[in-house]
From Swiss-Prot:
It comes from Legionella pneumophila (strain Paris). The lineage of its organism: Bacteria, Pseudomonadati, Pseudomonadota, Gammaproteobacteria, Legionellales. Keywords: Acyltransferase, Cell outer membrane, Membrane, Signal, Transferase. It catalyses: a lipid A + a 1,2-diacyl-sn-glycero-3-phosphocholine = a hepta-acyl lipid A + a 2-acyl-sn-glycero-3-phosphocholine; a lipid IVA + a 1,2-diacyl-sn-glycero-3-phosphocholine = a lipid IVB + a 2-acyl-sn-glycero-3-phosphocholine; a lipid IIA + a 1,2-diacyl-sn-glycero-3-phosphocholine = a lipid IIB + a 2-acyl-sn-glycero-3-phosphocholine. Homodimer. This is Lipid A acyltransferase PagP. GO terms for cellular component: cell outer membrane.
Amino acid sequence: MKRLISCLTIICALNASAAAETTSNPCSRWISFLKPVCQRFHQTWTEGHDDMYFSGYAWHNRYVYSNEKIKSYNETAWGGGLGKSLFDEKGNWHGLYAIAFLDSHRHLEPAVGYAYLKTASVNKDLKAGLGYSVLVTSRVDYDNVPIPGALPWAALFYKRITIAATYIPGSSREGHENGNVLYMLGKISL
């Protein structure tokens, strides 16, 4: 519960910070080579659509884990979150998100991050995207220390609904298995 409250506090603080920013150039204090990053974040936050995320599946790679291990893991990674996203002038997708879900050991795992997808239109309503996400998460089995990361991300967009997936790489050393999980999530643009 503390982690959920922490995630919500971060979201509220970011929203308050964005609302309080009244200057015409909110990224003026950023180092010059990071200004485009700030400007894209600001654009996504102020012009983007509100999103509701939901998760529900985490597939543990059967080539890495034993049947006994897989049976002990939670593959129904129920959770949800909020975000903001937009398609830029080139049609590529940018998203800011804060989510929390049940990890492989049924512990609550929060994550906040940014995702970028290079998209291709299949037709007017259907797009496919491939890109990455950079995020910060924390896990009980790592003493709840904030852990930064970068992951591949793929998605299918249909009107306001998105189905996305990422693969969390890991180690397959015997006795030290971790990662190697396909994580699925969905998003509805409000």
